[in-house]
């Protein structure tokens, strides 16, 4: 049941304040989750305001049914397709703010049946949308050790990636793993050193989840789409939860806030310089949760909020 899983929205006020809400504006919550950000945005909109929410998790779509508000609508799909949803509604260049809350939500982690958690035994699934794509167990069954090791190293920065990958392949050849506890125990046994502050399966579970859901590619596409549809002076507010996510967001905002970089000594006319394009975003800085929020919600500890504004054309 949805109500069994509490979700505390991280950096709630800060992320919504970063959108600089106008009462008659049009906004996108690209990651509805359980609706914390959406409800706060709606509370600041007037009768003419509009909010489009997006989520690829069927449980999030079900949770959105509790919002009976003519200003609100939701799409079941990946946030990477946000520009497509905007084009369908003929709203390109009219979006006043976009909020993205990246990563996995507390209800997804806490529901053992979703297969995201190494702390709770459940099916080895890890899909954000369990109705499409391959599950973690299906991929691990057919993947080569080198491919698994690459995923663990690239997306989890796991120092024992090769050792763990070999152990996974050897185990699956004898007794295929279908449960999260089986994988978590195998990783713990394959890891020669323990960090007393972190479960040995933390990085590997993160890596497999990111790969299964193409999370980093989804972020890159969503950011490009956001830039395409934002109105002049429209805001982009993005919360990330680990360094791989934040690195993508940081580089994107930095790149588009600098404009075209011309090497010194190359002669260009004014027309050529204009054709190369200038700054399209103004980075407005970053925020992290305070001690009080981290004490109340430990999962907020690694979160980073970055805000940018679309430059006038």
From Swiss-Prot:
S-adenosyl-L-methionine binds at residues 35-37, 55, 79, 101, 108. SUPFAM superfamilies: Putative methyltransferase TM0872, insert domain, S-adenosyl-L-methionine-dependent methyltransferases. Pfam families: Methyltransf_5. Its main location: cytoplasm. Signal peptide: none annotated. InterPro entries: RsmH, SAM-dep_MeTrfase_MraW_recog, SAM-dependent_MTases_sf. The keyword Membrane does not apply. GO terms for biological process: rRNA base methylation. It is an enzyme of class 2 (transferase). Specifically methylates the N4 position of cytidine in position 1402 (C1402) of 16S rRNA. Belongs to the methyltransferase superfamily. RsmH family. This is Ribosomal RNA small subunit methyltransferase H.
